[in-house]
């Protein structure tokens, strides 16, 4: 079971590493944000994966805290990416700094939880003859953590929805798939959180998200978009000739 699970983790991480390689070749702010998102995806996947495999309670506390913290920071960078990609709102440095401060304080709280258990406690249970720790008792600090996370998720979804509403159909192909897979991640994350299942199933869709983000943002322009752009250029040239 352990070997199969480790193999699954590797199969998830390898495509993301390939995306990091290709995104790193593009010199732009949005490409830089994508690389940061992808690196944090790997940290989030590994921390949750190691948490599931761990049979040591203290180490499980550390890994679950790292997973929750890295997910926070990942969402902040996805929000930064969505701002740069959709351009439906201007980047507010004070807001971004505030998000990092809140995430940092949350990270410190999660680290202290290893010793004081003031955010959540862990309990060992058997899942299909396999013992795993899962979050048992939750405090107000745990709900505040997820309240912050879901606020970031809402902002990300809102930015993509706003962009999709504002643009024509042939532009939407660069935004709808990313929004779709992100919504799946959000829904599965909520389901896993409510059910207290140790393994975050939503992480499986990080692979699809990383590929879509890199491909649609950095490497692909829809054929209709290219045709439309060329038609505008040709029309402009014709108008210029007529005026001349």
What do the predicted segments below correspond to?
Residues 4-55, 63-80, 99-116, 178-194:
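Hydrophobic alpha-helical transmembrane segments of multi-pass membrane proteins
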Residues 21-34, 57, 83-95, 161-174, ...:
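Membrane-interface helix-boundary motifs at transmembrane edges
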Residues 57-68, 198-206:
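Non-cytosolic membrane-interface motifs at loop->transmembrane helix junctions
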Residues 15-21, 77-81, 146-169, 214-220:
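Alpha-helical transmembrane segments in multipass membrane proteins, preferentially the mid-helix core
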Residues 220-244:
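Sensory modules in modular signal-transduction proteins
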Residues 43-51, 105-129, 140-198:
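Hydrophobic transmembrane alpha-helices
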Residues 1-15, 138-150:
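Hydrophobic transmembrane alpha-helical segments in integral membrane proteins
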Residues 2, 24, 167-229:
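Interfacial "cap-and-anchor" motif at the non-cytosolic start of specific transmembrane alpha-helices
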């Amino acid at each position: 079971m352990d070997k199969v699970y480790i193999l699954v983790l590797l199969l998830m991480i390898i495509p993301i590493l390939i995306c990091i390689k290709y995104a790193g070749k593009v010199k732009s702010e949005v490409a830089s944000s994508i690389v940061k998102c992808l690196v944090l995806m790997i940290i989030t996947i590994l921390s949750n994966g190691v948490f599931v495999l761990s049979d040591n309670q203290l180490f499980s506390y550390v890994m679950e805290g790292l997973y929750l913290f890295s997910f926070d920071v990942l969402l902040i960078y996805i929000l930064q990416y969505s701002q740069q990609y959709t351009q439906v709102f201007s980047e507010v440095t004070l807001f971004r700094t505030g998000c990092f401060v809140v995430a940092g304080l949350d990270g410190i709280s999660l680290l202290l939880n290893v010793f004081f258990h003031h955010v959540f406690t862990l309990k060992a249970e058997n899942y299909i003859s396999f013992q795993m720790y899962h979050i048992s008792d939750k405090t107000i600090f745990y709900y505040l953590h997820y309240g912050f996370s879901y606020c970031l998720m809402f902002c990300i979804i809102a930015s993509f929805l706003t962009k999709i509403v504002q643009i024509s159909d042939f532009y939407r192909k660069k935004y709808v798939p990313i929004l779709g897979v992100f919504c799946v991640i959000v829904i599965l994350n909520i389901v896993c959180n409510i059910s207290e299942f140790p393994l975050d199933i939503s992480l499986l869709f990080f692979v699809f998200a990383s590929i879509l983000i890199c491909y649609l943002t950095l490497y692909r322009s829809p054929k209709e978009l290219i045709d439309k752009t060329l038609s505008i250029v040709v029309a402009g040239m014709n108008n210029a000739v007529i005026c001349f």
